[in-house]
Amino acid sequence: MRLFLSLPVLVVVLSMVLEGPAPAQGAPEVSNPFDGLEELGKTLEDNTQELINRITQSELPAKMWDWFSETFRKVKEKLKIDS
């Protein structure tokens, strides 16, 4: 009786194994997840480069340097007068 029940089960299991993986269970493509990551990196690089260009072309760094220089000069003069 056991052999009579185990043979059909063995045939079904063997047919499932030999059939191969279902399309949804196939091996995922390795390059697919990395394509999105590469695109994200490229976008981040472009945005960073654009930001650096805007900062270097703006007057903000020059104004900040002038303000720091002027403040430092005033502090030096104040310390000379007090000493």
UniProtKB/Swiss-Prot annotation:
One of its GO terms (biological process) is lipid transport. It is found in: Secreted. The keyword Lipid metabolism does not apply. Keywords: Lipid transport, Secreted, Signal, Transport. Disulfide bonds: none annotated. InterPro entries: ApoC-1_sf, ApoC-I. Pfam families: ApoC-I. GO terms for cellular component: high-density lipoprotein particle; very-low-density lipoprotein particle. One of its GO terms (molecular function) is phospholipase inhibitor activity. Coiled coil: none annotated. Residues 1-26 form the signal peptide. Its main location: secreted. The keyword Ribosomal protein does not apply. Belongs to the apolipoprotein C1 family. Apolipoprotein C-I is present in acidic (APOC1A) and basic (APOC1B) forms in P.paniscus, P.abelii and P.troglodytes and perhaps also in baboons and macaques. The two genes for ApoC-I arose through a duplication process that occurred after the divergence of New World monkeys from the human lineage. In human, the acidic form has become a pseudogene sometime between the divergence of bonobos and chimpanzees from the human lineage and the appearance of the Denisovans. Pseudogenization resulted when the codon for the penultimate amino acid in the signal sequence was changed to a stop codon. This is Apolipoprotein C-I, acidic form. It comes from Gorilla gorilla gorilla. The gene is APOC1A.
